[in-house]
From Swiss-Prot:
Role summary: Bidirectionally degrades single-stranded DNA into large acid-insoluble oligonucleotides, which are then degraded further into small acid-soluble oligonucleotides.
Keyword Iron-sulfur appears in the UniProt entry: no
Highest taxon above the source species: Bacteria
Subcellular location: Cytoplasm
Name of the protein this chain belongs to: Exodeoxyribonuclease 7 large subunit
GO molecular function: exodeoxyribonuclease VII activity; nucleic acid binding
Species this protein is from: Rickettsia akari (strain Hartford)
EC number: 3.1.11.6
Length: 444
């Protein structure tokens, strides 16, 4: 086409603007959308926000223009000396008779350049504190699990299979691109989207997953916007990007890092069979401990009953002794009074200063009466004290008080005590005594 244009227009006269427009048309129509790899040099950013630089290789130079909207989408700082791959269209600028590449997309090229960008970004975000947040614990039994990954491929299948195999739980999938120019924005929006759901629909934990790949393939997971989304998430995040040897910046901002997507599923839920076995073990231990405790208290109740019967018999004997002592003291007092009255009568017959003798004997009688009364009262108080003390001891050992604390006595139909499950195996009728009464229970 270019040769035809030259042949057809060789003798025609052009104005400067005409030839410039023709050259522009030829460049744009013949090259279209291209990719060019080279090293940035002579970078200048105008006050308008547009960037102008050269892309060089050895002695060859290609002028490039990166307009402000495109520059704002670039996820790393541009500097002289960085090797990049640029996609765009060739055009010409009539102002200085040169052709240039209008940038549509710009990515770092070469492992060294990418690692330098990654290390610089990591240091900056670490200084900001995005990797030092307080980690949110992963819930033991999440009711819902959010998974952010590609809807196609083996990763989502492995996660679903592993969760269903270990402990079936509701899975909410948010499909995203895991590679490419806009993938980091999609993943960040998915994290924010899960956090903005209503509480009833919000997952308990989020898994961000992708299979293995090169540093270029995993580059989206080093994006600053994605790191900030993980840092700000109120839902715990498990990152599972690549293989065990692959590390991305989202791993440092997540609440837990899994070496593989399958491992992330294992971190999210326990194994149901192991959990059931553990619960059965705890149940067995609890039943054994409860059985031992019941037997211990049954033994105590039987002992308390024996002590109660012994003390009841002892108190009855003491009460009888106290009554007999009281009767004896009363009889002695009456006999003494009668004796003194007899003496008084005999003295009254003697006529020897009867008034004096009467006063003396009356005083003596009063003293003796007071002594006997005091002695009797002391004896009675002593017995009453012992009686009260023994009654208190008896009440503390009374098995009825034990029943009031929530225990019960189980007897068989014949009145025999049943202290274990084995002892009750052949019984059909049970008498259960509580603190406030007794009930009869018939086994179906």
């Amino acid at each position: 086409m270019l040769e035809n244009f030259i042949a057809n227009q060789a003798t025609k006269e052009f104005s400067v603007s005409e030839i410039s427009n023709k050259i522009k048309e030829l460049l744009e129509n013949n090259f279209g959308y291209i990719k060019v790899k080279g090293e940035i040099s002579g970078l200048k950013i105008a006050s308008s926000g547009h960037a102008y630089f050269n892309l060089k290789e050895n002695t060859a130079i290609l002028a490039c223009t990166c307009w402000r909207p495109i520059l704002a989408k670039i996820k790393f700082p541009l500097n002289d000396g960085i090797e990049v791959v640029i996609s765009g269209k060739l055009s010409s600028y009539a102002g200085n008779s040169r052709y240039q590449l209008s940038v549509d997309n710009l990515q770092p090229a070469g492992l060294g350049a990418m690692l330098q960008i990654l290390n610089d970004r990591k240091a900056r975000l670490e200084k900001e504190g995005l990797f030092n947040k307080i980690r949110i614990p992963i819930p033991f039994l999440p009711d819902k699990i959010g998974v952010i990954t590609s809807i196609t491929g083996a990763v989502i299948k492995d996660i679903i299979h592993r969760i269903r195999e270990r402990f079936p739980t509701r899975i909410i999938i948010w499909p995203v691109s895991v590679q490419g120019e806009n993938s980091s924005n999609e993943i960040a929006e998915a994290i924010e989207g899960f956090n903005n759901l209503a509480e009833v629909n919000k997952p308990s934990v989020i898994i961000v997953a992708r299979g293995g790949g090169s540093i270029e393939d995993l580059w989206s997971f080093n994006d600053e916007i994605l790191v900030r989304a993980a840092y700000n998430s109120k839902i715990p995040i498990i990152s599972a990007v690549g293989h065990e040897v692959d590390y991305t910046l989202i791993d440092l901002a997540a609440d837990k890092r899994a070496p593989t997507p399958t491992a992330a599923a294992e971190f999210a839920v326990p194994v149901r069979s192991i959990l059931n076995n553990t619960l059965h073990s705890y149940e067995k231990i609890l039943l054994n401990n409860t059985s031992r405790l019941i037997k211990y208290h049954e033994h105590n109740i039987i002992n308390y009953d024996k002590i109660h019967r012994y003390l009841s018999h002892y108190m009855d004997n003491r009460q009888q002794l106290l009554d007999e002592t009281g009767f004896n003291l009363l009889d002695a007092l009456l006999c003494f009074i009668e004796l003194q009255e007899t003496k008084i009568k005999s003295f009254s017959k003697e006529r020897v200063n009867p008034a004096k003798i009467l006063n003396y004997k009356t005083l003596e009688l009063t003293h003796q009466t007071a002594y006997l009364s005091k002695s009797a009262n002391n004896t009675l108080k002593n017995f009453e004290y012992k009686l009260e003390l023994n009654s208190t001891l008896l009440a503390s050992l009374d098995y009825n008080n034990v029943l009031k604390r929530g225990f019960a006595i189980v007897k068989g139909e014949t009145g025999n005590f049943l202290s274990s499950k084995i002892a009750a195996a052949n019984e059909k009728i049970f008498n259960i005594k509580f603190s406030d009464g007794e009930i009869k229970v018939v086994r179906n």
